[in-house]
């Protein structure tokens, strides 16, 4: 397996990550990618198949970052993001997705998400996005950037009314 630098000092604690996805195989895949490809610089604190369990874990032992699937039964990724960001020690949230219905990016940002990670991104890209969001850098892959621009163009008259020139 390849090693990907997360640009952190070796003396620092690993970045802790929580994963929420209703597919247990995706949870396991993300755990393997994050822990094995980062050579121990990322540690998966929990991998839950529903948002309620993940929020419970995060409230007792807050991770640095949560990867939250967007489309889940029950509480979806948007609502779980909103609830995670309301915790006393809120984690960074990256939306984990393979599809992006219209307005998903805009709604996720409004809920407090700081970026998107595609389930099909290369392992080194996923690791880099996790590390970079911890440094305060929003993380939007090309697909989410295109969708956000498209969403903004659809809402342009509304958006322009917010700008006072």
Predicted ranges, named:
Residues 26-27, 73:
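The feature encodes the CheY-like receiver
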Residues 105-109, 120-160:
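Short, flexible helix-to-coil linker/hinge segments that flank and couple to helix-turn-helix
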Residues 61-67:
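Active-site beta3 strand of CheY-like receiver
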Residues 50-53, 76-79:
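Acidic catalytic/metal-coordinating carboxylates
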Residues 21, 69, 73, 97:
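Active-site residues of response regulator receiver
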Residues 39-49, 57:
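Short hydrophobic/Thr-rich beta-strand motif most characteristic of the beta2 strand and flanking loop
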Residues 163-165:
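Conserved small/polar residues in nucleotide/adenosyl-binding loops
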């Amino acid at each position: 397996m390849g090693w990907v630098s997360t640009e952190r000092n070796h003396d620092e604690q690993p970045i802790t990550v929580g994963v929420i996805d209703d597919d247990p195989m995706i949870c396991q895949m993300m755990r393997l990618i994050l822990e094995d490809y980062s050579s121990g610089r990322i540690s998966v604190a929990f991998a839950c198949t529903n948002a309620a369990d993940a929020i419970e874990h995060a409230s007792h032992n807050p991770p640095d970052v949560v990867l939250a699937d967007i489309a889940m039964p029950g509480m979806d990724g948007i609502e779980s993001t909103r609830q995670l960001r309301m915790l006393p020690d809120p984690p960074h949230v990256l939306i984990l997705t393979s599809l992006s219905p219209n307005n998903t990016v805009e709604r996720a940002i409004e809920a407090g998400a700081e970026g998107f990670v595609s389930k099909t991104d290369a392992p080194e890209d996923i690791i880099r996005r996790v590390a970079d969001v911890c440094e305060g850098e929003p993380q939007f892959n090309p697909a989410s950037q295109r969708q956000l621009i498209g969403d903004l163009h659809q809402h342009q008259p509304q958006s322009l009314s917010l700008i006072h020139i």
